[in-house]
From Swiss-Prot:
UniProt keywords, alphabetically: Ribonucleoprotein, Ribosomal protein
Listed GO CC annotations: cytosolic small ribosomal subunit
Transmembrane helix among keywords: no
GO annotation terms (biological process): translation
Protein's name according to its UniProt entry: Small ribosomal subunit protein uS2
Family statement drawn from the similarity comment of this UniProt entry: Belongs to the universal ribosomal protein uS2 family.
GO molecular function, one term: structural constituent of ribosome
Species the sequence originates in: Histophilus somni (strain 2336) (Haemophilus somnus)
Coiled coil: none
HAMAP family: Ribosomal_uS2_B
Length: 239
């Protein structure tokens, strides 16, 4: 079972919040106190809250649920992509486009365009175009890949979103709320926990902390997917 210990979190610097002057009072229940002008997060709260979130992630994955990892901050971007690919899930790591969830119909059309361009680039269509037209299409494809590459095979809305940095990704959280999609989020001391179903109070800037969250989340998802596979095999054997 995916679990994270107090020691893991201390070593990764999960407890270091933001400077006290930037705090959000809604995070008061999760703050241990100030130290040298920085708020220290109470890991006695974070550890059980995160482990509870991991149990739920495993459950969602075991029901063949789609999990969308969201992290567009520079410190999170590449790690979010790697984590999602590692557990065969989906990601947005460049920029959240408004309506990515709430206007899925339009997003689906853009994904279709991206896949059409990918096919054209591989089947020789680009070679028949003028250099200028081929360049225009290549640039369009690269731009779409940057924005939608992580969700092009999602096939529909996700069953949950896992967010690194609630303040930075507030639009994604709001869209998920509007659609009733459960939100798991790392919430730092300068952020609001509003709209987050599974609040994980913690540092959302330190790369070691981000790696810890994502490593545990991917393990939880993989465990859930393995349960799903085992269940399918049991049913197949019974038939």
């Amino acid at each position: 079972m995916a679990q994270v210990s107090m020691r893991d979190m201390l070593q990764a610097g999960v407890h270091f919040g933001h400077q006290t002057r930037y705090w959000n009072p809604k995070m008061k229940p999760f703050i241990f106190g100030p130290r040298n002008g920085v708020h220290i997060i109470n890991l006695e709260k974070t550890v059980p809250m995160f482990n509870e979130a991991l149990v739920e992630l495993t459950r969602i994955a075991s029901n063949n649920g789609r999990i969308l990892f969201v992290g567009t901050k520079r410190a999170a971007s590449e790690v979010v992509k790697a984590a999602a690919l590692d557990c065969q899930q989906y990601y947005v790591n460049h920029r959240w486009l408004g309506g990515m969830l709430t206007n899925w119909k339009t997003v689906r059309q853009s994904i279709k365009r991206l896949k059409d361009l990918e096919t054209q680039s591989q089947d020789g269509t680009f070679d028949k175009l003028t250099k200028k037209e081929a360049l225009v299409r290549t640039r369009e494809m690269e731009k779409l890949e940057l924005s939608l590459g992580g969700i092009k095979d999602m096939g529909g809305l996700p069953d949950a979103i896992f967010v690194i940095g609630a303040d930075h990704e507030h639009i994604a959280i709001k869209e998920a709320n509007n659609l009733g999609i459960p939100v798991f989020a790392i919430v730092d001391t300068n952020s609001s926990p509003d709209g987050v179903d599974f609040v994980i109070p913690g540092n959302d800037d330190a790369s070691r902390a981000i790696q810890l969250y994502l490593s545990a989340a991917t393990t939880a998802v993989k465990e859930g997917r393995n349960q799903e596979t085992v269940t399918e095999e049991v049913f197949a054997a019974a038939e």
